[in-house]
């Protein structure tokens, strides 16, 4: 076996054995301690940390635009990485000596006993509920006032944009929407319970009966003949990557006869948006950029402040 890997594992075992038992048991929110070395283990937590004014001691790699999304690169310049969201490196986390770790039960429940021996863990139940992430992290990391202001500003922006959209669409309000993610070999439609779906719902957009009836956060469409399932007045659409195969799949889609019969294409309401913002960011900064995108593609004069 590789000697480097063996030494890293020995270091991890030794480091965990030297940590005080029960270090991760007390809830951070119940103490007056403000963590200074926070490690974030999912994208929405990293986004939220930056929004709260925290420069993490460590972050996981982004899903695309690696190693970190462009919109966060300046804020996170020089911040160490601790592996993938789906497989963070415990060895790297130990070496960074965090005093708090933000993780998600969805991704990291199996690792929680080990993580809690390294530092107190803030464990989020969901990775898609960005406002809950702000609330929990703000409370646990002693940034409650900042979190409250972020959420207040969010509500003001949503209320303002909703009013502008209602005026723009008039008697056609609320139009139904679908969010289409074009991938190499299939299309994924995001549902009301997803990260982008929750933002559109909060703005007052409608959903088709089929979308509302589906459980989960997305619907996988394996062939173009199933596209009518997600028919709507408006399509927000993005390409998963810049690869030629994704581009070919998109071009094949918009040339398909069924596509031409759908309401959004017929009404010229197919709007291309940023995939990182809409699908991968997962935090309140990304959600605010979604509002910017919506104001832009709908032609709201002056955007939304």
Curated annotation (Swiss-Prot):
It comes from the Bacteria. GO terms for biological process: achromobactin transport; chrysobactin biosynthetic process. Keywords: Ion transport, Iron, Iron transport, Periplasm, Signal, Transport. It holds the Pfam family Peripla_BP_2. CDD domains: FhuD. Residues 37-302 form the Fe/B12 periplasmic-binding domain. Gene3D superfamilies: Nitrogenase molybdenum iron protein domain. It is found in: Periplasm. Residues 1-29 form the signal peptide. Belongs to the bacterial solute-binding protein 8 family. Binds citrate- or chloride-dependent Fe(3+); part of the binding-protein-dependent transport system CbrABCD for uptake of the siderophore achromobactin. This is Achromobactin-binding periplasmic protein. The lineage of its organism: Bacteria, Pseudomonadati, Pseudomonadota, Gammaproteobacteria, Enterobacterales.
């Amino acid at each position: 076996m590789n000697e480097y890997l063996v030494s890293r594992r020995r270091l991890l075992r030794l480091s965990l054995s030297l940590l005080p038992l029960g270090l991760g048991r007390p809830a951070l929110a119940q103490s007056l301690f403000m963590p200074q070395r926070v490690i974030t283990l999912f994208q929405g937590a990293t986004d939220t940390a930056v929004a709260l004014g925290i420069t993490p001691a460590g972050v996981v790699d982004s899903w695309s635009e690696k190693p970190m999304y462009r919109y966060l690169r300046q804020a996170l310049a020089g911040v160490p990485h601790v592996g993938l969201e789906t497989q963070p490196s415990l060895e790297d986390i130990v070496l960074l000596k965090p005093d708090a770790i933000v993780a998600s039960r969805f991704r990291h429940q199996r690792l929680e006993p080990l993580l809690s021996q390294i530092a107190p863990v803030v464990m989020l139940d969901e990775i898609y509920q960005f406002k809950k992430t702000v609330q929990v992290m703000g409370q646990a990391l002693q940034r409650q006032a900042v979190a409250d202001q972020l959420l207040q500003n969010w509500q003001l922006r949503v209320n303002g944009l909703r009013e502008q959209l209602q005026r723009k669409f008039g008697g056609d309000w609320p139009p139904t929407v679908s969010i289409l993610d074009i991938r190499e070999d299939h299309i994924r439609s995001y549902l009301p319970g997803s990260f982008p779906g929750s933002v559109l719902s909060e703005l007052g957009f409608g959903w088709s009966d089929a979308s509302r009836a589906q459980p989960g956060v997305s619907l996988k469409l394996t062939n173009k003949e199933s596209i009518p399932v997600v028919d709507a007045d408006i399509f927000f659409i993005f390409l998963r990557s810049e690869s030629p195969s994704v581009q070919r799949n998109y071009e094949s889609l918009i040339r398909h006869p069924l596509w031409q019969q759908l309401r959004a294409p017929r009404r010229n309401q197919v709007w291309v948006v940023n995939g990182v913002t809409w699908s991968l960011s997962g935090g309140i900064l990304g959600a605010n950029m979604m509002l910017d995108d919506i104001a832009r593609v709908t032609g709201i004069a002056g955007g939304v402040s």
